[in-house]
Design a protein with these regions (language model features):
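Hydrophobic anchor at the beta1->P-loop junction of P-loop NTPases
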Residues: 5
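P-loop (Walker A) phosphate-binding loop of NTP-binding proteins
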Residues: 8
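ATP-binding Walker
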Residues: 11
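Walker A/P-loop
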Residues: 14
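Conserved substrate/cofactor phosphate-moiety recognition/catalytic segment
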Residues: 21-67
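ATP-dependent NMP and nucleoside kinases share a basic, alpha-helical "lid"
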Residues: 80-141
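NTP-dependent small-molecule kinase module
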Residues: 135-195
C-alpha cells in the first residue's frame, strides 16, 4: 500500500511524517531526497525557465521518483512525503505558473508514462488557508522556502483543483489543528487504508 501526503509548503506534512515515525513504526516513511538531482541541475547549468532545460530537469526528477517508488513498494505500507503525483503535477503545471505555454505531455511522454505507473493508492491532501500557511512559514526557521510565495499564489490554485477532483484523494483541513492533532489525524487516516 502506497500512501502520500500532499499540500502546500508549510502545511505540516513533514511534522505529520515525524509523528508517524514516532507513533506508527509499522509504516515505512519515504522522504523526497533530491540532493543529487539539484546537484546535477547545477552542474549542467540548467535553468527551469528555459523550455529545453526544463525538459532535461524534469527527466531527472521523473526518473528519481520512479526509483523512489520501487524502493517504497518493498514494504507492506509506505507513506510518501509527496509521491509520484507531485512530480506529475509539477511537471505539467509549473510552466503554466510562469505564463509559459510549453508542450510537455508529448515531449516527456515516456517519462510521464513511467511515473504514472508509480501513483499512490491513496492521497491525503492537507489544506489550510493562506493566512495559516504564511503563519506556519514564519514560525519555521528550519527552512528557507524561497519559492513559497510563488507556490502559494500560482501553484496552489492549480494544485487544489488538480487534486480535489481525484477519486483517491481525501482532504484534511488543518487550520484549527495543532501539530500533534494533525499527526494524530494523519495516523488515523493511514491506519484506515494500510493493509
Amino acid at each position: 500500500m502506497i500512501l502520500s501526503l500532499q499540500g502546500c509548503m508549510a502545511v505540516g506534512k513533514t511534522t505529520a511524517i515525524k509523528y508517524l515515525q514516532k507513533n506508527a513504526p509499522y509504516i515505512n516513511v519515504s522522504y523526497e531526497d533530491h540532493t543529487d538531482v539539484i546537484e546535477e541541475v547545477k552542474r549542467r547549468g540548467l535553468d527551469k525557465n528555459i523550455y529545453q532545460d526544463y525538459l532535461e530537469i524534469q527527466k531527472l526528477w521523473l526518473h528519481k521518483e520512479v526509483e523512489r517508488y520501487q524502493k517504497a513498494i518493498e514494504f507492506p505500507c509506505s507513506i510518501m512525503d509527496f509521491g509520484a503525483e507531485e512530480i506529475e503535477f509539477y511537471t505539467i503545471n509549473y510552466p503554466k505558473s510562469i505564463g509559459a505555454d510549453w508542450e510537455i505531455e508529448n515531449a516527456l511522454k515516456r517519462e510521464l508514462d513511467e511515473v504514472r505507473k508509480c501513483m499512490p493508492d491513496r492521497i491525503l491532501f492537507l489544506d489550510a488557508s493562506d493566512e495559516v500557511l504564511r503563519s506556519h512559514k514564519q514560525n519555521d526557521s528550519t527552512r528557507t522556502r524561497n519559492f513559497f510565495e510563488h507556490h502559494l499564489q500560482y501553484m496552489m490554485p492549480l494544485k487544489r483543483a488538480w487534486f480535489i477532483r481525484r477519486e483517491n484523494v481525501d482532504v484534511l483541513r488543518v487550520d484549527d489543528l495543532s501539530a500533534e492533532e494533525v499527526g494524530q489525524k494523519v495516523k488515523e487516516w493511514c491506519d484506515i487504508y494500510r493493509r
